[in-house]
Design a protein with these regions (language model features):
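Domain-level signature for soluble enzymes in the chorismate/prephenate branch of the shikimate pathway
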Residues: 1-88
């Protein structure tokens, strides 16, 4: 692999990494807003049935190459991270 190709691919990966970071931060803001609203309504913040529906929906629309197991592991961690972040 040429140095120019390595550089170009690394730049593209870095762009995707920044996009992922932006998306996670945007998701955290939305979840924090949802949590505040649920608290005012007396609704439990965590909804395990909704989390499972989310995972199933993502599995259905995942074009790959991320495996089903990989998707579940990734989103389980994102959900856990989200709960930790909005509860701090």
């Amino acid at each position: 692999m040429s140095d120019a190709l390595v550089r170009r691919l690394r730049e593209q990966i870095a762009e995707r990494d920044r996009a992922i970071l932006d998306a996670v931060n945007a998701r955290l803001k939305l979840v924090a807003e949802l949590k505040r609203h649920k608290e005012t309504q007396g609704i439990d913040f965590v909804d395990t049935e909704q989390e499972e529906r989310l995972l199933q929906g993502l599995e259905t629309t995942n074009p790959g190459p991320l495996s089903r197991e990989g998707l579940r592991r990734l989103w389980t961690e994102i959900l856990a991270l989200t709960k930790r972040e909005v509860n701090d």
